[in-house]
């Protein structure tokens, strides 16, 4: 979703209004990114958790209102498998999947939660991110890198700025 910000950065659209767009990485009808990375992309759980932290960092530093889904903030790996081998995931997609709160009892779960807490505080306490003007600075498509930033220009003499460099390559 963040890649799409480039399209709207220099055009007056509702997407520029930080109070209009709801952003999310997963929703109720999708598997978690962690599940997809581990089950389908051959990531280890640790690699998937690190990648999820990166995506969360982009989510919380981009325009709009971030939305989290059940346990995402502590690395809950939710999704479905084709356990009976018939290629039909519908039953499992619709089944009740309670959050596994025991994840918070291990170091990975706590580390993940701490990262999300820091992102929430950064967004809450940094006026450049929460109230500032968005700037689409650079895009290096071949290298899968984007650079964007914010400047709090609400008061004269205020020079609060944030620059985000996001490298999407492995």
Mark where each language-model region is.
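Aromatic- and carboxylate-lined catalytic core of secreted/periplasmic carbohydrate-active enzymes
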Residues: 99-140
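Histidine-centered active-site microenvironments of extracellular/periplasmic hydrolases
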Residues: 80-91
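Acyl/amide activation-and-transfer machinery of modular secondary-metabolite enzymes
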Residues: 90-100
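Conserved alpha/beta catalytic core and glycan-binding cleft of carbohydrate-active enzymes
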Residues: 1-81, 124-130, 134-135, 139-170
């Amino acid at each position: 979703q963040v890649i799409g910000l480039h399209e709207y950065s220099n055009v007056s659209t509702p997407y520029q209004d930080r109070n209009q767009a709801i952003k999310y990485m997963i929703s109720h009808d999708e598997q978690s990114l962690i599940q997809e990375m581990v089950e389908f992309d051959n990531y280890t759980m640790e690699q998937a958790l690190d990648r999820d932290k990166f995506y969360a960092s982009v989510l919380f530093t981009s325009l709009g209102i971030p939305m989290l889904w059940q346990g995402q903030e502590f690395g809950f790996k939710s999704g479905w498998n084709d356990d009976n081998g018939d290629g039909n995931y519908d039953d499992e997609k619709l089944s009740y999947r309670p959050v596994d709160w025991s994840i918070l009892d291990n170091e990975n779960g706590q580390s993940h939660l701490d990262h999300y807490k820091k992102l929430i505080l950064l967004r809450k306490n940094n006026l450049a991110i929460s109230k500032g003007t968005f700037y689409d600075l650079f895009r290096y498509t071949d290298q899968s890198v984007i650079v964007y930033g914010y400047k709090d220009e609400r008061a004269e003499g205020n020079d609060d700025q944030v620059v985000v460099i996001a490298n999407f390559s492995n």
